[in-house]
Regions:
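Small-molecule pocket liners
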Residues: 105-109, 202, 212-218
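Short beta-strand->loop
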Residues: 90-101, 156-159, 192-210
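Bacterial signal peptide processing site
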Residues: 9-12
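C-terminal motif of bacterial Sec signal peptides marking the signal peptidase cleavage site
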Residues: 3-7
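A ligand-binding cleft/hinge motif common to bilobed small-molecule-binding domains
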Residues: 77-88, 145-148, 174, 179-199
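Bilobed "Venus flytrap"/periplasmic-binding protein-like clamshell domains
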Residues: 15, 19-43, 55, 78, ...
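An extracytoplasmic/periplasmic, membrane-proximal ligand-sensing/linker region
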Residues: 18-21, 26-37, 209-213, 217-275
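Alpha-to-beta junction loops
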Residues: 48, 66-75, 87-90, 126-128, ...
Length: 275
């Protein structure tokens, strides 16, 4: 698997680089560009080099954490609980969502705007697009919403596909290549605002319950002082330009228990093992 890697300068000589993994919830080059300024900030705050690792699939970040190849990772809730099955890791912080004012976001199921489908219970036998199989809002929560309407994604859909990212799912639905798809709502809004998909080309038919935000997760083997320094660096971000680039109003602490519901649902839906 090919990674997009970048060094962020300014670290003190002799310090080992902090290796950061990022799930590719959109195209890897876009993810790396989005988080490069954060890498620069962390390098400055921590006094060490920072290396970014953005693979082409979610499971590679879990694998890298399990193999001690990265120290810190931005996971979704599902990839975090997958990682904690295989490694000693802990969540530190998550972002405050500007659209909700808290640390949650939502997943949605969408259909083409001209579709006759009005509700999730009409999707039996439909062709459906998920994002990555390991995506919280692109796989797990759409599966939860389908299950709530009596549809088991494993047996009751027509054909289903994993597009690999929210942007690809939105494009597949907007073009009519599938009957419906699931993705993160705030990413859908961003894709419409930036013109990646035509505004109004898809229609939301279901919104999930609030989802706890993407956790920044650290290896427990790192010294406690280092883990605290990393958490403090996030909590102390006050640069409005940087926060805007990160699509965050700030950061708050999170705990392992905040993601227990994700683990419970993933077990029930056979999504706990990364693919």
């Amino acid at each position: 698997m090919i990674a997009v890697a970048g060094g962020c300068g300014g670290g003190a000589s002799g310090e080992e680089a902090l290796r950061i993994g990022l799930i590719p919830n959109q195209a890897p080059d876009e993810v790396e560009a989005e988080y490069q300024p954060l890498g620069d900030y962390l390098s400055e705050e921590l006094g060490r080099e920072v290396e970014l690792f953005v693979p082409t699939g979610y499971p590679a970040v879990v694998e890298a954490m399990a193999n001690d190849e990265i120290d810190l990772a931005l996971f979704g809730g599902l990839t975090y609980v997958q990682a904690r099955e295989r490694a000693e890791v802990s969540p530190l912080v998550t972002d405050i969502n500007p659209r909700t004012g808290d640390t949650t976001y939502r997943s949605v199921i969408v259909v083409p705007s001209d579709s006759d489908i009005q509700a999730v219970d009409e999707l039996e036998g439909a062709d459906f697009a998920f994002g990555s199989v390991s995506s919280t809002s692109g796989s797990l929560y759409p599966s939860i919403m389908l299950a709530g309407a009596g549809i088991d994604y494993r047996t009751d859909l027509g054909e289903f596909t994993y597009t690999g990212g929210h942007d690809a799912t939105a494009a597949a639905v907007a073009s009519g290549n599938v009957d419906a798809g699931g993705l993160e709502y705030r990413i859908l809004l961003d894709l419409e605002e930036e013109g990646t998909i035509e505004p109004g080309s898809v229609r939301v038919i279901e919104r999930s319950a609030p989802v706890e935000g993407y956790p920044w997760v650290v290896r427990d083997a790192l010294p406690e002082e280092t883990r605290d320094e990393i958490a403090d660096a996030f909590l102390n971000i006050d640069d409005e330009e940087l926060l805007s680039l990160l699509n965050a109003d700030g950061y708050e602490r999170v705990e392992a228990a905040d993601y227990d519901y994700v683990e419970e649902q993933a077990r029930q839906l056979d999504l706990l093992t990364e693919s």
